[in-house]
Amino acid sequence: AQANGHYIFINSGRTYGFMPEAIKEFPFDGYVCGCGTEVIFLGKTLYHYDLDEDLKHSLQSILEECKIQAVYEGRKSCYFQKTEKPFAPITAIRNSYAKTNLEQPIRFFDDPVLDFDKFVILTDENSSLDLFHERTKEHFDFIAREEMHPYGFEEVVPKGCSKAGGIDYIVEHLGESLASCYVFGDSTNDLSMLTHVKNSIAMGNSYPEVLANTSYVTTPIERDGIRNALKHFGLI
């Protein structure tokens, strides 16, 4: 596709530092990271959303009041609560991120410097999710994700940031239009961009909500889904 003059971007909920190394080995032209909180093109950061410092430090007390566990996601570190009983998915995330090549991938909420762009929350039957939304909705948008049974799972993103917004930034930077964009997705956090672009492609193994909100469904990822869709649209 690149040989035919097309730019290829990764549009991910992850911040750049925690993008899988296997992804970074490919010569992508750019990245939309952290649900639109950072836009990178040809190795340079074109846009980055900086969260207010007081806001970042105010979140811990709200999370504790609402009995919600979270992971703050930064470009160089992720921050974890110090708790005797972390939810199982939190432990799994920490163990996975600890293996990255970053200098200090794991930090904690009591760190004097909180450098993060977005965060994820996990809830159980004791959590007060509605109260959390009420306390934070002025500053954040919420993306309901597939449950990590028995835990609820949401991404919390600075208000106005999204995967769709990241696409808009790139389109404007390149002087292109949304009509020239082709978007691939398989998860509920892809819906903002899949419903934003006309040429939206769901992988065949996508969640039902995704399959119902795209213009084209390709084969599953393990059955050359991306290649087949690129051929279908004449991009290769």
What do these predicted ranges mean?
Residues 5-9, 174-181, 198-199:
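Short beta-strand/loop segments at the ligand-binding rim of alpha/beta enzyme cores
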Residues 62, 68-69, 73-184, 188, ...:
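Conserved acidic, metal-coordinating active-site core of Asp-based
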Residues 26-27, 35, 139-140, 196-197, ...:
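Short, structured coil segments at secondary-structure junctions
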Residues 17-21, 131, 166, 192-193, ...:
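Phosphate- and divalent-cation-binding pockets in alpha/beta enzyme and binding domains
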Residues 9, 32, 182-184, 201, ...:
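Hydrophobic/aromatic beta-strand patches that form the interior of the parallel beta-sheet core
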Residues 196, 200, 204-236:
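Asp-based, Mg2+/Mn2+-dependent phosphohydrolase catalytic module
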Residues 2-89:
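Active-site phosphate-binding/coordination module
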